[in-house]
Protein backbone atom coordinates (compact mmCIF):
# COMPACT_ATOMS: atom_id res chain seq x y z
CA UNK A 1 0.00 0.00 0.00
CA UNK A 2 1.16 3.53 -0.79
CA UNK A 3 1.19 6.31 1.80
CA UNK A 4 -1.52 8.95 1.61
CA UNK A 5 -0.08 12.47 1.71
CA UNK A 6 -2.18 15.65 1.53
CA UNK A 7 -0.82 19.19 1.53
CA UNK A 8 -2.87 22.18 2.68
CA UNK A 9 -1.98 25.82 2.00
CA UNK A 10 -1.28 27.71 5.21
CA UNK A 11 -2.28 26.79 8.73
CA UNK A 12 -5.20 24.35 9.09
CA UNK A 13 -7.61 23.97 11.97
CA UNK A 14 -9.53 21.08 10.41
CA UNK A 15 -7.95 18.18 8.54
CA UNK A 16 -10.48 17.29 5.84
CA UNK A 17 -9.67 14.88 3.01
CA UNK A 18 -11.62 12.98 0.36
CA UNK A 19 -12.69 9.40 1.07
CA UNK A 20 -15.16 6.85 -0.27
CA UNK A 21 -17.67 4.81 1.71
CA UNK A 22 -19.54 1.78 0.43
CA UNK A 23 -22.61 -0.22 1.43
CA UNK A 24 -21.40 -3.82 1.95
CA UNK A 25 -24.75 -5.28 0.86
CA UNK A 26 -25.31 -3.35 -2.37
CA UNK A 27 -21.85 -2.13 -3.47
CA UNK A 28 -23.35 1.40 -3.58
CA UNK A 29 -20.49 3.91 -3.18
CA UNK A 30 -20.39 7.53 -2.10
CA UNK A 31 -17.50 10.02 -2.29
CA UNK A 32 -17.36 11.98 0.96
CA UNK A 33 -15.35 14.55 2.87
CA UNK A 34 -13.62 13.02 5.91
CA UNK A 35 -12.65 14.98 9.02
CA UNK A 36 -9.64 13.43 10.82
CA UNK A 37 -9.99 13.73 14.61
CA UNK A 38 -7.31 12.28 16.91
CA UNK A 39 -9.55 13.07 19.88
CA UNK A 40 -12.34 10.81 18.61
CA UNK A 41 -12.44 7.13 19.53
CA UNK A 42 -14.60 5.89 16.66
CA UNK A 43 -15.44 6.61 13.06
CA UNK A 44 -18.76 8.42 12.71
CA UNK A 45 -20.97 9.04 9.69
CA UNK A 46 -23.65 11.64 9.13
CA UNK A 47 -27.31 10.71 8.91
CA UNK A 48 -27.15 11.82 5.25
CA UNK A 49 -24.46 9.22 4.44
CA UNK A 50 -26.51 6.47 6.09
CA UNK A 51 -29.57 7.51 4.05
CA UNK A 52 -27.80 7.92 0.69
CA UNK A 53 -26.11 4.51 1.02
CA UNK A 54 -29.34 2.92 2.32
CA UNK A 55 -27.42 1.39 5.21
CA UNK A 56 -29.29 -1.04 7.44
CA UNK A 57 -29.12 -0.26 11.14
CA UNK A 58 -27.46 -3.13 13.01
CA UNK A 59 -28.06 -1.81 16.50
CA UNK A 60 -27.87 1.13 18.87
CA UNK A 61 -24.99 2.03 21.11
CA UNK A 62 -24.57 4.55 23.92
CA UNK A 63 -21.73 7.03 23.42
CA UNK A 64 -20.19 9.74 25.57
CA UNK A 65 -19.32 12.99 23.80
CA UNK A 66 -18.58 16.56 24.78
CA UNK A 67 -22.36 17.11 24.71
CA UNK A 68 -23.07 14.26 27.12
CA UNK A 69 -24.28 10.68 26.76
CA UNK A 70 -26.57 9.72 23.90
CA UNK A 71 -27.77 6.69 22.00
CA UNK A 72 -26.73 6.45 18.32
CA UNK A 73 -27.38 4.08 15.43
CA UNK A 74 -24.75 1.52 14.45
CA UNK A 75 -24.02 0.35 10.86
CA UNK A 76 -21.36 -1.56 8.93
CA UNK A 77 -19.71 -0.24 5.77
CA UNK A 78 -16.46 -0.23 3.81
CA UNK A 79 -14.09 2.74 4.05
CA UNK A 80 -11.69 3.45 1.17
CA UNK A 81 -8.91 6.03 1.49
CA UNK A 82 -6.33 7.27 -1.00
CA UNK A 83 -3.21 5.13 -1.02
CA UNK A 84 -5.18 1.87 -0.98
CA UNK A 85 -6.43 1.68 2.62
CA UNK A 86 -9.67 -0.35 2.69
CA UNK A 87 -11.46 -1.54 5.81
CA UNK A 88 -14.87 -3.06 6.56
CA UNK A 89 -15.98 -1.68 9.90
CA UNK A 90 -18.61 -0.71 12.39
CA UNK A 91 -19.59 2.96 12.16
CA UNK A 92 -21.76 5.11 14.36
CA UNK A 93 -24.23 7.73 13.18
CA UNK A 94 -24.09 11.31 14.31
CA UNK A 95 -26.79 13.75 13.28
CA UNK A 96 -24.35 16.25 11.78
CA UNK A 97 -20.60 16.60 11.35
CA UNK A 98 -19.74 20.24 10.59
CA UNK A 99 -17.88 20.58 7.28
CA UNK A 100 -17.65 16.84 6.57
CA UNK A 101 -19.67 13.70 5.91
CA UNK A 102 -17.65 11.33 8.09
CA UNK A 103 -15.33 11.67 11.06
CA UNK A 104 -12.24 9.44 11.13
CA UNK A 105 -11.27 8.61 14.71
CA UNK A 106 -8.47 6.68 16.38
CA UNK A 107 -10.04 3.34 15.46
CA UNK A 108 -8.85 4.05 11.88
CA UNK A 109 -5.83 6.28 12.57
CA UNK A 110 -4.46 3.55 14.87
CA UNK A 111 -4.06 1.17 11.92
CA UNK A 112 -1.00 3.03 10.70
CA UNK A 113 1.40 5.92 10.93
CA UNK A 114 -0.34 9.31 11.07
CA UNK A 115 1.78 12.45 10.97
CA UNK A 116 0.69 16.09 10.86
CA UNK A 117 3.31 18.73 10.23
CA UNK A 118 3.43 22.46 9.57
CA UNK A 119 6.30 23.74 7.45
CA UNK A 120 7.38 27.23 6.53
CA UNK A 121 9.25 27.57 3.25
CA UNK A 122 10.16 30.98 1.83
CA UNK A 123 7.74 32.67 4.26
CA UNK A 124 4.87 30.47 3.05
CA UNK A 125 3.31 28.08 5.53
CA UNK A 126 1.92 24.74 4.46
CA UNK A 127 0.50 21.87 6.44
CA UNK A 128 0.78 18.22 5.47
CA UNK A 129 -0.67 14.96 6.70
CA UNK A 130 0.76 11.53 6.07
CA UNK A 131 -1.09 8.26 6.65
CA UNK A 132 0.41 4.83 5.96
CA UNK A 133 -1.13 1.49 6.85
CA UNK A 134 0.17 -0.88 7.96
CA UNK A 135 2.49 1.05 10.22
CA UNK A 136 6.13 1.27 9.15
CA UNK A 137 7.27 2.92 12.39
CA UNK A 138 8.29 6.02 10.45
CA UNK A 139 8.98 9.06 12.59
CA UNK A 140 8.74 11.82 9.95
CA UNK A 141 8.71 10.95 6.25
CA UNK A 142 7.71 14.54 5.44
CA UNK A 143 10.89 16.12 6.83
Predicted regions and their residues:
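Pepsin/retropepsin-fold aspartyl endopeptidases
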Residues: 1-143
